[in-house]
Amino acid sequence: MLPGAAGASFEFWPAMDAFVKLDDRFRLYFTAAFVRGMEPDATSGEEIYRDVTFGAHLDLTLKPIFRPRLRTSDWERQRYVWVRAGYRYGTTIGEVADPFEEHRGLLEQTGRAPLPSAFWLVERSRLEFRDVDDTSSTRLRFRLTCEREMPIGGRETIPYVNGELYYDFRADALKRQRYQSGVEVILTHRWRIEPYFSYQVEMHSDDEDVAALGLNFKYYR
């Protein structure tokens, strides 16, 4: 069992992502993500909260070396090194006890390396410049993913597991760990779906740990 699992709250994380290829080096990425959960409330006992995040990003290939024997046409998995710059806006929906508003700029780098038995190791480093309720902070996120392409039930799929660390420069401390397992299922040339389970450990906070089911819909053009 992960640390604090017995006292974790549960959330649902649906999202819609759209990827627009501009050429062999550039791609646009848009996202709309939703969070639904429950937290204790002094008057009503429990309160449902809903958060929403919108984002726009530009992806750029740094090392466009195409992988051999790739089953499916995939912009990011065909590239060994690429970077992303973007902006995200997040806020609560409706009246809640603890509303928030966040503006977030981000820069990230993703690299891929082959492993034995057709597995791949994917490293992502992300620097986030956050303004949450007029309070500024900078956060570094480092994620390692292990994935493998394989056919399941007549469809190409990409099962994966990953772990991620969050470092807050303002607190000068590791603030969060996140562990995730899921599978990306290729439905058509343009559509994919990604169900997953995620567990989030809060390391230096009174906030509860979070267990979440996620469902991403992905559109490629």
Report the location of each language-model feature.
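Detector for outer-membrane/organellar transmembrane beta-barrel domains
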Residues: 104-106, 110-166
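Residues that define the transmembrane beta-barrel architecture of outer-membrane proteins
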Residues: 10-12, 48-54, 101-105, 136-142, ...
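Outer-membrane beta-barrel domain signature
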Residues: 2-7, 41-47, 94-100, 131-135, ...
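Transmembrane beta-strands of outer-membrane beta-barrel pores
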Residues: 4, 32-38, 87-93, 113, ...
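Short glycine/proline- and aromatic-enriched beta-strand/turn motifs that initiate or cap beta-hairpins
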Residues: 1-46
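Repeated loop/turn-to-beta-strand initiation elements of outer-membrane beta-barrel proteins
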Residues: 24-30, 63-69, 80-83, 116-121, ...
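Hydrophobic/aromatic-rich structural module bridging two neighboring secondary-structure elements via a short loop
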Residues: 44-110
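Outer-membrane beta-barrel "beta-signal"
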Residues: 60-61, 109, 209-221
